[in-house]
Amino acid sequence: GFTDITGAQNSIDIENLARFAVDEHNKKENAVLEFVRVKSAKKQVVSG
């Protein structure tokens, strides 16, 4: 399942991933969304 990532608001790695996701979305959809901040983040643990 999914679990919360503690300290996500202060994580440079998570912020960089979010900025990348917004940039990629804007390229594919010809949109002009702007990244503002990370509110929360979750991770998924997959076994196997």
Curated annotation (Swiss-Prot):
Pfam family membership, one: Cystatin
Keywords: Protease inhibitor, Thiol protease inhibitor
Matches recorded under InterPro entries: Cystatin (IPR027214), Cystatin_dom (IPR000010), Cystatin_sf (IPR046350)
Residue ranges of the motif Secondary area of contact: 44-48
CDD domains per UniProt: CY (cd00042)
GO molecular function: cysteine-type endopeptidase inhibitor activity
Record field: transmembrane: none
Coiled-coil residue windows: none
Family, per entry: Belongs to the cystatin family. Phytocystatin subfamily.
General function of this protein: Inhibits papain and cathepsin B (very poorly).
Protein name: Cystatin
Organism (species): Glycine max
